[in-house]
From Swiss-Prot:
Gene3D superfamilies hit by this protein: HUPs
NCBIfam families: 7-cyano-7-deazaguanine synthase QueC
Protein name: 7-cyano-7-deazaguanine synthase
Record note on cofactor: Binds 1 zinc ion per subunit.
Amino acids binding ATP: F22, S23, G24, G25, Q26, D27, S28, T29, T30, C31, L32
Family: Belongs to the QueC family.
Function summary: Catalyzes the ATP-dependent conversion of 7-carboxy-7-deazaguanine (CDG) to 7-cyano-7-deazaguanine (preQ(0)).
Enzyme Commission (EC) number: 6.3.4.20
Chain residues that bind Zn(2+): C215, C230, C233, C236
Gene Ontology biological process terms in this record: queuosine biosynthetic process
Length: 252
């Protein structure tokens, strides 16, 4: 009989433990709050890849610090559920592969085939693969991401079909039982603001407005009612329009 030994550092799989792809932006912060409401233990993962808006990595720490002292509207103590943060450095690989406006200095506009020049080919596929590899070792079987098909700027790796295909591929390739959660998949940006309010109330909304970062240009010099940003790029436009729609609906 062959004796089996545990793999050093390998945690037992837990489906009430989650790993959130956390960039420091509005969507991933909302997803982190969503996960903290639902799961007993939540860790976060972020990536540096030469992104133009690298200021988002600075926002991550501040957002986590505030969330660690917050509770949800349900009464859940988010601080007791918030676990380790992991940052993986992907170097300049995505810049060399993608040649995107998100990793370079070219204008952000609609390019060939109708895709924005900010599209980084394979980015979410790479992120999910690294996240699953980390989750496999740490026993985290719920992967939570802010991908959205409603306000997704035309990115094909944000589509629901893509995420379902990735879940199948990751589970097959790692012999695991990952569940890829995308709570924003069918929400408009206005509904994402409303979700944040339902999860953490005015305190979470204020945190998102003040500390999260969405602007593709990395602009933190201009403060708008909905947060910081250039106010012109597609990411700022989506965030601003969603905020206005949510405010209008809330006051009706």
């Amino acid at each position: 009989m062959i004796e089996t030994k545990p793999i050093p550092g390998l945690a037992l799989p837990r489906h009430d433990h989650a790993l959130v792809l956390f960039s420091g932006g509005q969507d991933s912060t909302t997803c982190l709050a969503w996960a903290l409401e639902r799961f007993a233990h939540v860790e976060t993962i972020g990536f540096t890849y030469g992104q133009r808006h690298s200021v988002e990595m600075e926002c991550r720490g501040r957002v986590r610090q505030v969330l660690a002292h917050m509770s949800g509207r349900s009464g859940a103590d988010w601080g007791s559920r918030l676990g380790d943060d992991h940052v993986l450095d992907l170097g300049n690989a995505l810049h060399h592969v993608g040649q995107s406006a998100l990793t370079g200095r070219s204008p952000i506009e609609i390019g060939q085939g109708g895709l924005p020049t900010s599209f980084v080919p394979g980015r979410n596929l790479i992120f999910l693969t690294y996240a699953a590899a980390l989750g496999w070792r740490r026993g985290l079987r719920r992967m939570v991401g802010g991908m959205c098909e409603t306000d997704y700027s035309g990115y094909p790796d944000c589509r629901d079909d893509t995420i379902k295909a990735m879940q199948l591929a990751l589970n097959t390739g790692m012999e695991a039982h990952f569940v890829l959660e995308t709570p924003l998949m069918w929400l408009t940006k206005a509904e994402t603001w409303a979700l944040a309010d339902s999860l953490g109330g005015p305190a979470l909304v204020a945190l998102i407005e003040e500390e999260t970062h969405t602007c593709y240009l990395g602009d933190r010099s201009q403060r708008h009612p909905w947060g910081y940003g250039c106010g012109e790029c597609p990411a700022c436009s989506l965030r601003a329009e969603g905020w206005r729609e949510w405010q209008t609906a809330s006051s009706a």
